[in-house]
UniProtKB/Swiss-Prot annotation:
Similarity comment: family membership: Belongs to the aerolysin family.
Region (Interaction with glycans from host GPI-anchor): 347-356
Residues carrying the site annotation Important for heptamerization: E391
Organism listed in the record: Aeromonas salmonicida
Molecular function via GO: toxin activity
Disulfide-bonded cysteines: C44-C100, C184-C189
GO biological process terms, semicolon-separated: killing of cells of another organism
Gene3D superfamilies: Aerolysin/Pertussis toxin (APT), N-terminal domain, Proaerolysin, chain A, domain 2, Proaerolysin, chain A, domain 3
Entry function: Secreted, cytolytic toxin that forms pores in host membranes after proteolytic removal of a C-terminal propeptide, leading to destruction of the membrane permeability barrier and cell death. The pores are formed by transmembrane beta-strands and are approximately 3 nm in diameter.
Keyword Disulfide bond appears in the UniProt entry: yes
Protein name: Aerolysin
A single Gene Ontology CC term: extracellular region
């Protein structure tokens, strides 16, 4: 029994079905588009043209494998390609049949289907909904296995692929397999092919943020700082009064479901702003979403005013310090990634393994599904290069297209590759501190005695009667508070 375990990023199959848009001798030619026509030398059906010599050279192995031992088939410009009995020789000549290629190839792109959104829940709930959905999951992956050549992808009580399937929990994953109860008829019909879904991971989508009703406190007065800006000179003085402080933002979140423990963030991102509460929250990358329960951020902020103080006068200065808080329920979408492992014996009458074995080997193959699977890894087979001889080392996608049709494979792979998302929900709370503007009052003339006492000082301007309790402010989240005054130079 032959066993293989191979991993691949099935998302790359989208590019594997991309067809040439503008054809020329230098453009890739995909063998599944080449058709045989027995209409005479160099004659093709409407909408087709003869394959050129250079195009035939690029896919010679595929063409020769489709020809009889002594077959000779025409190409453009009086060239022919000869069958395996002639070692696939390409030379000048004529033939009564022709290899043809479409003038306007049909686009082979995989359709991008709308996201499948699974309701928020614990991890096992999300997985259960995924693997038990017949239309969105069981049938598409079952048909993929069938198209690749796996035998008996269905249960004993239905003649159709992907029906009468049992889903069981196995370790950290799920096993989908045809029901084997009762009798069945057919070679090795009791050996049902299986599809294992495992190795789940979930990646947060920062741009998918949404929130419910917002509860916001508005600004609440914490403390008012007061002082006097005093001018001891005989001339008016323009001054700069500056309040400088470290502003703290404290935040926390709670998660509704345990799925959040398995969700990770791919890149760091800023928590979206909601309401009027000022926040600057950065969520780290490559960490469990549940582990990021909260934190605090600090930034230094300055507020200033530039009043002119009359001679021998004071201007009252006042700054109000506030705090505010906000809370709301939130939701982010999370991309679901997983491994899809097919195992069973391949049909002798036709399978898509690149060697097309006819001895019914048992084969195991793992596709890695999801937008964040396989990124950065060296892919052993660039399947978008299926037109290059020797590059097909796993599945022969040209064969599947020839066997089942381009549109069938497009539709099936589109359904298998449909993005799957669930939701991460919870409640968010944050508190922020901030200062209002510096308010300047009306000038107050200093008494002659006070001016005389100060006349010996070198200071021309100063802050007097300062009411600022640094320790009390620090307890309220305002650190390193200072209030200064300097004359404008």
């Amino acid at each position: 029994m032959m066993n293989r375990i191979i991993t691949a990023n099935l998302a790359n199959l989208a590019s594997s079905l991309m067809l040439a848009q503008v054809l020329g001798w230098h453009e890739p030619v995909y063998p599944d588009q080449v058709k045989w026509a027995g209409l005479g030398t160099g004659v093709c059906a409407s909408g087709y043209r003869p394959l050129t010599r250079d195009e035939a050279m690029s896919i010679k192995g595929n063409l020769v494998s489709r020809m009889g031992q002594w077959q000779i088939t025409g190409l453009a410009d009086r060239w022919v390609i000869m069958g395996p009995g002639y070692n696939g020789e390409i030379k000048q000549g004529t033939a009564g049949e022709t290899w043809c290629y479409p003038n306007s190839p049909v686009s082979g792109e995989i359709p991008t289907l709308s996201d499948w959104n699974i309701p928020a829940g614990d991890e096992v709930d999300v997985q259960w909904r995924l693997v038990h959905d017949n239309d969105y999951f069981i049938k598409p992956v079952s048909y993929l296995a069938h198209y690749l050549g796996y035998a008996w992808v269905g249960g004993n009580h239905s003649p159709y692929v992907g029906e009468d399937m049992d889903v069981t929990r196995v370790g950290d994953g799920w096993l989908i397999k045809g029901n084997n109860d009762g009798g069945c008829s057919g070679y090795r019909c009791g050996e049902k092919s299986s599809i294992k879904v495992s190795n789940f991971s979930y990646t947060l989508e920062p741009d998918s943020f949404s929130h419910g009703q917002v509860t916001e406190s508005g600004k609440q007065l914490v403390k008012t700082i007061t002082a006097n800006a005093t001018n001891y000179t005989d001339l008016p003085q323009q001054v700069v009064v500056t309040l400088k402080y470290d502003k703290a933002t404290n935040w926390s979140k709670t998660d509704t479901y345990s799925l959040s423990e398995k969700v990770t963030t791919k890149n760091k991102f800023q928590w979206p702003l909601v309401g009027e509460t000022e926040l600057a929250i950065e969520i780290a990358a490559s960490q469990s979403w549940a582990s990021q329960k909260g934190g605090s951020t600090t930034e230094t902020v300055s507020v200033e005013a530039r009043p002119t103080v009359p001679p021998h006068s004071s201007l009252p200065v006042r700054v109000a310090l506030y705090k505010s808080n906000i809370s709301y329920p939130y939701e982010f979408k999370a991309e679901v990634n997983y491994d899809l492992t097919m195992k069973g014996f391949l049909r002798w009458g036709g399978n898509a393994w690149y060697t097309h074995p006819d001895n019914r080997p048992t084969w195991e193959h793992t596709f890695r599904l999801g937008p964040f699977r396989g990124q950065g890894e060296q892919h052993p087979l660039p399947v978008d290069k299926r037109y290059i001889p020797g590059e097909v080392k796993w599945w022969d996608w040209n064969w599947t297209i020839s066997e089942y049709g381009l549109s069938t494979m497009q539709n099936n792979l589109g359904r298998v590759l449909r993005p799957i998302r669930s939701a991460v929900t919870g409640d968010f709370y944050a508190e922020s501190q901030f200062a209002g503007d510096i308010e300047i009052g009306q000038p107050q003339t200093r008494s002659a005695k006070a001016a005389q006492l100060r006349s010996a000082s070198a200071e021309e301007v100063a802050l007097t009667s300062v009411d600022l309790d640094s320790e009390a402010l620090a307890n309220e989240g305002f650190g390193n508070v200072s209030l200064t005054i300097v004359p404008v130079q």
